[in-house]
């Protein structure tokens, strides 16, 4: 048996069992190399549709396609061994009907070999979540700020910060949990509301701009590494790789133009005659 096959990958039931337990650590990844690094420390790797922003420069996640998610999901699965890999269902791949959602989710599982899918929406998507869950597809929910709805929302502002706005978000969270999701992301929601949802739903909550009381946390990898020029309020920078990478590229360009690179140690000499 190979070393890789001997390593047990985390599953959706493993994450479901972490409710009120040790905090769940989750980060995004879109490449095999970063997936290998993230895999060492994280319980869950999210192949997020945020790849549209990070990799392709889109202003929103709306243009992301199912084929794009499959391509990067495959890369992350090849680069990781231990973490549960969850792949986002992109806008337009699941909203039309339960059947459309099943066919899209089945493609994601079959073609990437990931362990679960994530979709946005609460009450309106509960029937779809139940349909998928009953057919062997683990679903991670996503409530609060739902970026795929940007054209309806108008902006990426935090939710539940005004009195009288909590009930719809609570209803969404409850509907997702009762429909059979194994966990849910709570994004950009007022801290007291995120805390209350975490205390009342039976499945783990994973916060992003939510509350330290959530059962876990997630960030976009490039945001926390300092690779994004701008980051939301809820991001803590754990590195400043952007300036480091720029300095390295500047040094490379300088050495090429001055012919300092390549040096003698970087080129191949002729083999001696026998």
UniProtKB/Swiss-Prot annotation:
Keyword field: Cytoplasm, Magnesium, Metal-binding, Pantothenate biosynthesis, Transferase
Binding site for Mg(2+): 49, 88, 120
Location in or out of the cell: Cytoplasm
Location (main, coarse): cytoplasm
Entry binding sites for 3-methyl-2-oxobutanoate: 49-50, 88, 118
Active-site residues, Swiss-Prot/TrEMBL: 187
Family: Belongs to the PanB family.
Protein name: 3-methyl-2-oxobutanoate hydroxymethyltransferase
Organism: Nitrobacter winogradskyi (strain ATCC 25391 / DSM 10237 / CIP 104748 / NCIMB 11846 / Nb-255)
Taxonomic lineage from the root: Bacteria, Pseudomonadati, Pseudomonadota, Alphaproteobacteria, Hyphomicrobiales
